[in-house]
Amino acid sequence: MSKNKLVAYAVSMLVVMNQLSGCSTLEKPVENKTVAPPQFEPFIRLSDEAFGFVGSLRRPTDRVLGSTVLIGSNVALTAAHCLIDSDISYVEFAGNKYEIDYTVCYEVGSYRNHDIGLVFLTQDVIGVDPVGRVDDVLGSIKKWDYVTTIGYSRGFKKASSLSTFRYYGVLYNEENQIKMLPNRGSIWFGDSGGGLFWFGDNGFELIGIIVSFSKMEGFIVENSSIRVDCYEGWIDYEIEKNKLLNSQTE
């Protein structure tokens, strides 16, 4: 048998033996490598359409001035300090611009004790359902419950991760404010007027309007929101007054 035939025969026998034995080409062993744990992200970037009931207050330059939360077809809550002596031009919900009819603050001309205000629009917001509100924060939420913020700090929309904020409670002489403890993340400029939310028996509901953070020795130690349930009577009164005004102009 010629040399070439012997080589071909040997190769064919190896192929047959490999098929019969079910073996395959051995791969080079890979060394075990320690996989780094996933990095904790305190906030999740959102599209403008996600949680569409949280919108933004915009300057004439289209830059974000603050945040706002839709609670009725044409009315939104925000922080009063975003409305007083500001250059707010329009409101944006789910990427759509809406003209402002007028604004009103609980504490006229000031926000020192009651940093909450309402923004009334010239038309209803389209394609966005207003968010529900918790009517009894103290009776519903327990200390250390997870709470979620949604706002427009740093110019884009974001929601806090599940474990970023815990509900701490309400302090004496500041009963209209909710204190939440930040974990490796904090609200920031631009989040003001946005929402603090809690997931309860009625689903995802608004409990507060974001207003401030406090620093101690260079570190942010707590974040504050205005309790919406403390202002239910005022909110309902202003909404009814707006409906009456609109009915008179029709």
Where do the protein language model's features map onto the residues?
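Classical Sec-dependent N-terminal signal peptides that target proteins to the secretory pathway
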Residues: 2-25
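C-terminal subregion of chymotrypsin/trypsin-like serine protease catalytic domains
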Residues: 24-36, 71-76, 168-169, 188, ...
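Conserved catalytic-core segment of clan PA serine endopeptidases
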Residues: 27-49, 60-63, 84-127, 131-139, ...
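A conserved glycine-rich beta-strand in the N-terminal activation segment of trypsin-fold
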Residues: 52-73, 193
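Short hydrophobic-aromatic micro-motifs
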Residues: 75-79, 119
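Short, surface-exposed secondary-structure boundary micro-motifs
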Residues: 79-81, 152, 201
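Chymotrypsin/trypsin-fold serine protease catalytic domain
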Residues: 112-186, 212-238
